[in-house]
Regions:
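Short amphipathic alpha-helices and their capping/turn segments at secondary-structure boundaries
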Residues: 63-78, 109-119, 146-157, 214-219, ...
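Catalytic domains of carbohydrate-active enzymes, especially glycoside hydrolases
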Residues: 41-58, 121
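Glycine-rich, proline-tolerant flexible connector loops at the mouths of alpha/beta enzymes
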Residues: 55-75, 129-133, 173
Length: 288
């Protein structure tokens, strides 16, 4: 082989040896934490430099014309919309995954809300376990939860949507909720083993319930599509409580995570300034 033929090969070898850039996360905000109209909330998110937003049940009464208007507004603000709720009325309606008697209502509710997700071009939908049921053993409810997730996953697969299951703390915010930690959430992911069922890791809820956040993140990372962010106590801005978010973000970076990091806290001051600071701090920690 002559020298001029060898040089391109050497160049390609050298390039493959270079460190690859770290996967990029997408910043988002849960809209219920902001004040004002839906349009006001989108503008707040855009002004703070966020890339996307997460909805809860705002869309429940929207017409097709409303949906097109919202999509146009989000595009004009350069905002994505990443998640809605598959069961926005889970506290009010009998749609718990831990009760087999409610399975039909659950599946109908999920299918209905995934229709909104498709129209809004949103790739994920939040799925709640529901509250524990009096008179049924933990094992019975767990088996129902696993089966419910699988059935919901099949509905989601037909719609081309990923469902993300969220554990919530029962110590402070959601007494009686069944799936109360991401440790249990990881066990659920392994047992369900469905490509359309993944985990939402709310760092605030996990800190309140069990602590040991970084180790649990490391174990659960392959299943996580979204992280929710808030400090403890108070569920306020990162940096106002006991949690070292710089270390948490660095741990997430080491896992080559490339999903969403969503601010779900109650801003103590001006929301634009607060969210700007929070996202800048997250980016700085993950680029260090």
């Amino acid at each position: 082989m002559q020298r001029r033929e060898l040089l391109p090969l050497l160049g390609s070898v050298a390039l493959t040896g270079l460190a690859q850039p770290a996967p990029q996360v997408t910043s988002s905000v849960m809209l219920w934490t902001l004040k004002g109209s839906f349009e006001d909330k989108l503008e707040t998110a855009a002004k703070a430099g966020l890339q996307s937003v997460e909805l809860v049940g705002e869309y429940s009464a929207w017409t097709d014309a409303d949906i097109e208007r919202v999509k146009k507004l989000a595009r004009s603000l350069r905002l994505g919309m990443d998640t809605i709720s598959a069961t926005p009325n889970w506290k009010r309606d009998p749609i718990s995954m831990v009760d087999p008697a409610q399975r039909s209502n659950l599946l109908q509710e999920v299918e209905k809300n995934l229709t909104f997700a498709r129209k809004l071009e949103i790739p994920m939908a939040l799925l709640m376990s529901g509250d524990a049921i009096e008179g049924k053993s933990y094992a019975e409810q767990w088996a129902s939860l696993v089966e419910g997730c699988k059935r919901c996953g099949d509905v989601a697969a037909k719609a081309g949507i990923t469902l993300i299951v969220e554990p919530l703390n029962t110590k402070v915010n959601h007494k009686g909720y069944f799936l109360d930690s991401c440790v249990a959430g990881l066990k659920l992911m392994k047992e369900v083993d469905h490509p359309n069922i993944r985990l939402l890791f709310d760092i605030y809820h996990e800190q309140v319930q069990l602590g040991d956040v970084i180790r649990t993140i490391q174990a659960a990372a392959p299943y996580v599509k979204v992280f929710h962010i808030a400090d403890n106590p108070g569920r306020n801005d990162p940096g106002t409580g006991e949690m070292n978010y710089n270390n948490i973000y660095r741990a997430i970076k080491k896992l080559n995570y490339s999903g969403y990091i969503t601010m779900e806290y109650l801003p103590l001051g001006d929301p634009v300034a607060s969210l700007t600071k929070a996202v800048d701090a997250m980016r700085a920690a993950m680029s260090a």
